Structures are given as structure tokens and as C-alpha cells.
Regions:
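Short, small-residue-biased leader/transition segments that mark boundaries at the very start
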Residues: 1-3
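A generic, lipid-embedded transmembrane alpha helix
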Residues: 5-16
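Membrane-anchoring hydrophobic segments
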Residues: 16-17, 36
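Membrane-interface helix termini and inter-helical loops of multi-pass transporters
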Residues: 19-24, 82-96, 199-210
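Short helix-capping/hinge motifs at transmembrane helix termini and TM-loop junctions
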Residues: 20, 83, 118-119, 147, ...
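C-terminal transmembrane helix-loop-helix hairpin of multi-pass membrane proteins
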Residues: 28-33, 44-46, 50-68, 130, ...
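Generic multipass alpha-helical transmembrane bundles of integral membrane proteins
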Residues: 30-43, 63-145
Length: 241
């Protein structure tokens, strides 16, 4: 993580000197760390707890929390050393149609990458990526176009991913979990978690609590969306054994 942030800061400084790139782009260092946030155990822990598999659920949740705390703490320390700040991103001067198309494309490749990291075959990764592109773009469009709160939009996106995965499972036999979890890992609010810890570190407690509360709500909403989709499409999942 130290190497990653140092490389980003060095490349940004070179870009500033060589190409007069604005310092507003230093906010992009946050994006370089988001893949470290353990979305898979966060989401699967919620599914395990819904099935009353408490041991697996609590173990995965504890593991995810430990990784998040270590990752965000180190990122905060490196941000202080390199004088990086998690500023807001600049608004994109794009039309709504082009913005949606780019979201679909970027979401596809983001989910595809996560799925490959989970050792999925290319065909399964592409299927999960297609689901994720639709679900994540829906989530973002709901927030931007309707003003829906981010947790509610995350629930809608996860529910959509779960329903699509269930439909595809019936036709090609891919394991449901191999499609649903990678497709919504991209929705895990790593940015919110990092900003919460950063603001705690600089004692901006009001901002820290706000970011942390938003992150918790989204983290809860994501597995809930998958759980509701599973309840609607899988009769055996509706009952405890």
C-alpha cells in the first residue's frame, strides 16, 4: 500500500511538472486503493448470517473489518506523509446518454476484473460482468436521476443482480454465488470507509460519522438485496433447516 500511494504521488507530480495537470486529480489516489477493500467477505457474511450460519458469517465479517481497518489506517498515514487529501471529484461534462454508456462499459470491466481475481473462468467472469454492468449502472442512475438515497439504490442494484443471476443460473448452470457476489463487489463503499477513517484521523468527527454511517447503510443494503432476490427465486432458501 505504501508503494502504491508513493507511485501515485510520484506520477501525479511528474504529470504536474511535465503536462501542467491540475492538482485536483490527486483525489484519484483513492481509486488506486479501492480494490483492497474486502467486498467479498462483507457480502457473503451477510448472506451467511441470513441463513443463520453464524460461525461463517461472524468469521467473515471479522476478517473484513480487520482488513478494512488496516487498509484505511495505512492509507490515511500515507496520505498525511504525501500530503494527499480525499477531495471531491470534479463533475464530468458529459451528456446523460454518453455518461450511461461509459458507466456500463467501466462497470463491465471492473466486475470482470474482480471476477478474474476470484479465479472464475473467463466465460463466467464475462457473465458476472454483464450482470454487474446493468446492476451498478442502475444504482448510479437512480442516485443521479431520481435523488434516491445511496443505500436504497444499492439495495435496488443488488436485488437486480440477484434476480438476473437466478435467471441465468437456470439456463447455463453457473453457481449463483459466483455471479452475484462479483457483480456487486464493485458497489462496496470503499471510498466512504476511507473518508470516514481519514476524517476520524484529523478529528473532523462530524464528517467522519456521516461517511461511516453512509458506508454501513450501503454495506447492509448490498447483501439484503441478494437475500431478497434469493428468497423470491429459491424456495429452499425461504426456510431455515
Amino acid at each position: 500500500m505504501c508503494i502504491r500511494d508513493s507511485i501515485y504521488a510520484a506520477l501525479l507530480k511528474i504529470a504536474e511538472m511535465a503536462f501542467n495537470v491540475s492538482t485536483i486529480h490527486e483525489a484519484g489516489y483513492i481509486c488506486s486503493m479501492l480494490f483492497i477493500i474486502p467486498g467479498f467477505p462483507f457480502i457473503t457474511s451477510g448472506i451467511d448470517l441470513a441463513k443463520l450460519d453464524l460461525r461463517s458469517g461472524l468469521e467473515r465479517l471479522a476478517y473484513a473489518i480487520i482488513i478494512v481497518m488496516v487498509a484505511t489506517m495505512f492509507a490515511w498515514i500515507m496520505a498525511l506523509l504525501l500530503q494527499l487529501k480525499p477531495m471531491d471529484f470534479e463533475d464530468l461534462d458529459l451528456g446523460p446518454v454518453l455518461h450511461l454508456i461509459l458507466r456500463l462499459i467501466m462497470s463491465f470491466f471492473g466486475v470482470f476484473g474482480f471476477s478474474i481475481m476470484f479465479n472464475s473462468p473467463a466465460s463466467m467472469a464475462a457473465t458476472a460482468a454483464l450482470i454487474g454492468a446493468i446492476a451498478n449502472s442502475l444504482r448510479l442512475e437512480l442516485v443521479d436521476l431520481t435523488g434516491m438515497p445511496a443505500p436504497a439504490a444499492a439495495f435496488a442494484g443488488a436485488l437486480t443482480a440477484g434476480l438476473l443471476a437466478s435467471f441465468i443460473k437456470e439456463n447455463n448452470g453457473y453457481p449463483r454465488i459466483s455471479l452475484t457476489v462479483p457483480s456487486i463487489v464493485i458497489m462496496v463503499p470503499g471510498l466512504y470507509l476511507y473518508r470516514a477513517i481519514y476524517n476520524f484521523g484529523i478529528m473532523a468527527l462530524s464528517d467522519a460519522v456521516s461517511w461511516f454511517a453512509s458506508a454501513i447503510m450501503i454495506i447492509i443494503a448490498l447483501p439484503l438485496g441478494l437475500i431478497f432476490a434469493r428468497i423470491l427465486t429459491d424456495k429452499t432458501f425461504r426456510y431455515c433447516t
